[in-house]
């Protein structure tokens, strides 16, 4: 049974990222959510070995793009009642929050994650 309707503005948890989006379709097991803003940037590295740097493949995870649609299971979608921020500003804030946490951490995993974040920010914000 669906709790939300098409057009509802929600907070969706997708992998390790958190997004504000609009429901564009209700399906039996999930909602199709169109991304409007980023609340939490996805974590970097191997999700099967969290916070470990010495892994065979250290994943670079991008935030979902503005307008990108993704399937999110019903139980991972919550109501969102606030104002929807500008996508680019929300992405800047989410990456800044992640950077601050990683700088505090100081582990090898955090250093590798910061390296990935540097690359992603150049791509996101067209920095040289």
UniProtKB/Swiss-Prot annotation:
This is Kinase-associated lipoprotein B. A lipid is attached at residue 26 (N-palmitoyl cysteine). It is a lipid-anchor. It is found in: Cell membrane. Residues 1-25 form the signal peptide. One of its GO terms (cellular component) is plasma membrane. A lipid is attached at residue 26 (S-diacylglycerol cysteine). It comes from Bacillus subtilis (strain 168). May play a role in the activation or the expression of KinB. Keywords: Cell membrane, Lipoprotein, Membrane, Palmitate, Signal. SUPFAM superfamilies: Kinase-associated protein B-like (SSF141251). Its main location: membrane.
């Amino acid at each position: 049974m669906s709790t939300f309707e098409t057009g509802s503005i929600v907070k969706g948890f997708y992998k390790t990222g958190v997004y504000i989006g609009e429901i564009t379709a209700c399906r039996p097991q999930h909602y199709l959510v169109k991304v409007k803003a980023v609340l939490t940037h996805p974590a970097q590295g191997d999700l099967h070995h969290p916070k470990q740097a010495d892994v065979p493949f250290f994943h670079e995870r991008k935030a979902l793009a503005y307008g990108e649609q993704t399937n999110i299971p019903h139980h991972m979608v919550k109501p969102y009642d606030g104002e929807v921020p500008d996508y680019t500003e929300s992405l800047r804030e989410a990456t800044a929050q992640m950077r601050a946490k990683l700088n505090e951490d100081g582990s090898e995993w955090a250093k590798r994650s910061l390296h990935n974040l540097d690359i992603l920010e150049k791509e996101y914000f067209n920095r040289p």
